[in-house]
Amino acid sequence: FSVSLPEAGSYYFHMSSIGKIPARRKVSVSAQSPVWNVGKLYMKDDARTLGEVRVSAQRPLVKVDIDKLVYNLEEDPEAKVSNTLDMLRKVPMVTVDGDDNIQLKGNSNFKIYMNGRPSGLLSSNPSAVLKSLPASSIKDIEVITDPGARYDAEGVSGIINIIMVRRVLDGYTGTVSAEVTANEAYGGGTFVSLKAGKLGLTANYNLEYEREPIADITSFRENLSDDANRYLSQIGEHWEREKMHRGYLEGTFEIDSMNLISVDANLFRKRQKEFSDLSVEMRDMNRDLIYAYDRFSQNQPVFGSVEVNANYQHETRRKGELLTLSYRFTNDPNDDENRMRITGTSNYSDFLQWDTNRAKTNEHTGQLDYIRPIAGGHDLETGVKYILRQTDSEITQRLYDETSGNWHEPSGSFVDFSHTQHIYSVYLGGTFRWNKLGIKAGVRAEGTSLDVSYSNDLTKDFHSNFVDIVPNVTLSYSIGQSQQIRLGYNMRIQRAGIDYLNPYVDERDPLNVSYGNPDLDSEKSNSVNLNYTLFTQKFNINASVSHAFVNNSIEQYTFMDTERPNVSVSTYGNIGKRHQTGFSLYMNWSPVPLFRFFMNGGVDYISMENEERNLSNSGWSGRAFAGVQFSFPKDFRLNMNAGYMLPKIQLQGKRSDFLFHGITLNKDFFHKKLTFSVYCKSPLMKTWKMENKTYNNAFTLYETENKVMREFGISVSYRFGSLTDTFRKIKRGIVNDDVKDCGGKDVD
């Protein structure tokens, strides 16, 4: 490592280490390069021995840099028994709501990376993946609210970067874990890493099965424009079964001290079975029954990701100079199969329907990055990148013919859709430091070539090209050793993912249908962030104020079908002007070594408007999460927490508030190699009523679900192995953060 010195001259450095004799070294530096490259330090062993020392102080959980904030999961005892999704609730400026949707600064438009690179398994289903990922396998979670020019321009609110634990030392180490709950859910996993000479391997695998309890659901809609089909009611039950696999394999090889190669692969696969059984009634304005039927549906989505990364890193003899060449391939299948049975009970005919949607996204990415330090602790970075993204969807609808006993495809029901993007980008940026002042600035240019085609209807094909210039700048000022003020401006863009683009018509509910919009443009956002941080030995605080505005926001909207006036239709469009002003606050207080209190929350005022459809909405949204941690003798730990979220504002309504709490007790055995835990989520309430209200001048829709909250579980993990030496890791890699996804996974 190197040490930057204030001016030219001679200095004495005093060095000490436990078990070593203190040493002193004199060094001299010039005005042209006031930096001491430390190199190797040699210290003699101290023959004296120490008695047993018990360290009871707690390390800080949060630290800050010019453009980001870092939450250290390795130092949080609760991470040993929690999944990563639950731990995200404790990360400053991050929120997880009652439906497991993730938000950054109160906004769902952001990106999640793994180890500084985009990850296919996290781009399409982050909640599901993070819920299956043990928090004990995570080292840090970085919140990058002011991404620099090196990052893709997408991700309106910023980036959440998940850094995996790097237990890759000479020798081997591993962890095995298992968990079971009273709600018929179980899971387990293993982590192994080893190093032999210049070769290092890391592997991780997790399996999870969940059987969600039956939930009561209701839906009431009033159609203000159709007196004959005025009132629609649907009452019934919903339940799910799901099974998830997640695996990770990484290998590194040190060619020499200057060159490093790494290859890694990620695998995620989730198979669900969703069931709903509903009684449906339609009544006129006088509340007389028009028709009624029972609807049973079984939906089987299968989705996941296969991802392969290859990186070559070259370091020069200039400290910090780095050249990285990276390639990435991802395959993200997203299949869906739905079978629906309608049984008429009054003025309605029986029928069976079978829909399939075979969708996938393949992506090839190549990237070259170069960073060069310059005198005075500054550095410059530049790079180029190319992405080929191919999205396909094949849609088939079948109806059952009672007379022939065969399935047949209605005319026009088959759709073969293809969406191809070529994205070219180049960037230039720099980081500059002068004593207490730091500046990070850059500019990125992205060109996009877009082709959309329909094999069964060539008249719908289209092609477009466009270029975006994206600037960014962040200023930071350090007040003493423990305080920092940061001001940043970012322009970001967001491209629509397959869930937004897919024209597949979801008719699981024939009276409330939905589909994507392949004509969506990328949305552009401008944001300003002001951040203050104070860190002391016992008290930490991070406060931020931000404002963001988008003039062509991608929003979901609902309307009544003009050809079928009893059917509501939901789709997406660049229809929204969105302004969001927010305040976020994080506090951590440790008055004594064995106790910690934390609080993470924020409040936002959101305003949305669409003049063309005469739609608008505004209001306050907020969230709060707080808890305490106790560390007792004999390696016992107790964690208690609670959270509350205000209703979420939408263009045509709002979603209900949400309350939850939990308690966890941990005990370590055998020198902290074995950890046993018991926990309970929301022990004081069995269910919570989730509500969703959607409305405009033509209709009002009110939906509810009684979500089961109470859950008891136990988990156990065991750590084994021995390690003696570290090996190097690739410092930079590919980051694709340009796709906006939804479809039940972080819906905005």
Identify the function of each model-found stretch.
Residues 235, 363-367, 408-415, 420, ...:
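Outer membrane beta-barrel strand-and-loop segments of large Gram-negative receptors
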Residues 84, 117-145:
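Short acidic/polar hinge/loop motifs at secondary-structure boundaries
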Residues 14-20, 34-77, 97-99, 105-109, ...:
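Short, acidic, small-residue-rich periplasmic hinge/interaction motif at the N-terminus
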Residues 158-176, 215, 233, 244-250, 449-451, 481-526, 547-565, 683-697, ...:
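Surface-exposed extracellular loop regions of Gram-negative outer-membrane beta-barrel proteins
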Residues 6-28:
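A short, solvent-exposed loop/turn motif at the edges and junctions
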Residues 153-160, 168-217, 241-246:
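Outer-membrane beta-barrel translocator/receptor signature
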